[in-house]
């Protein structure tokens, strides 16, 4: 469960390491984001020679959350950290690699590129 001011790790190779959530997309009263939801983020920590710079604003999709997500079969999935993947204006991945496992819910939300590049889909 990610909300405004939440800090997340970045699970791709764009050069960003940590981001701060500015907004959860999907309506004015939308408070929380879970796996597969889009958020607006500000880059707080980045590598010196990466594609993104510190302070830049971008959109991202949440790929892992510490708060468990309930599935249709009654099982739950949770991860050790909150992580996201940065997106460009067209809604496509900015990076070319994904680090760490991602949730199967991304496939249902049509983020096929992220699912195909991830080393493990849980």
Curated annotation (Swiss-Prot):
Part of the 50S ribosomal subunit. Forms a cluster with proteins L3 and L19. In the 70S ribosome, L14 and L19 interact and together make contacts with the 16S rRNA in bridges B5 and B8. The gene is rplN. Pfam families: Ribosomal_L14. GO terms for cellular component: cytosolic large ribosomal subunit. Binds to 23S rRNA. Forms part of two intersubunit bridges in the 70S ribosome. InterPro entries: Ribosomal_uL14, Ribosomal_uL14_bac-type, Ribosomal_uL14_CS, Ribosomal_uL14_sf. Keywords: Ribonucleoprotein, Ribosomal protein, RNA-binding, rRNA-binding. One of its GO terms (biological process) is translation. This is Large ribosomal subunit protein uL14. GO terms for molecular function: large ribosomal subunit rRNA binding; structural constituent of ribosome. It comes from the Bacteria. Belongs to the universal ribosomal protein uL14 family.
């Amino acid at each position: 469960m990610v909300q405004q001011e939440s800090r997340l790790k970045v699970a791709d190779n764009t050069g960003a390491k940590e981001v701060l959530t500015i907004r959860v997309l999907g309506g004015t009263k939308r408070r929380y984001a879970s796996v597969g939801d889009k958020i607006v983020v500000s880059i707080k920590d980045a590598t010196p020679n990466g594609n993104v710079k510190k302070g830049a604003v971008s959109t991202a999709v949440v790929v892992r959350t510490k708060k468990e997500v309930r599935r249709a079969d009654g099982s739950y999935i949770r991860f050790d950290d909150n992580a996201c993947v940065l997106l460009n204006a067209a809604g496509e991945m900015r990076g070319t690699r994904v680090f760490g496992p991602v949730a199967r819910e991304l496939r249902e939300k049509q983020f096929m590129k992220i699912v195909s590049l991830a080393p493990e889909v849980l």
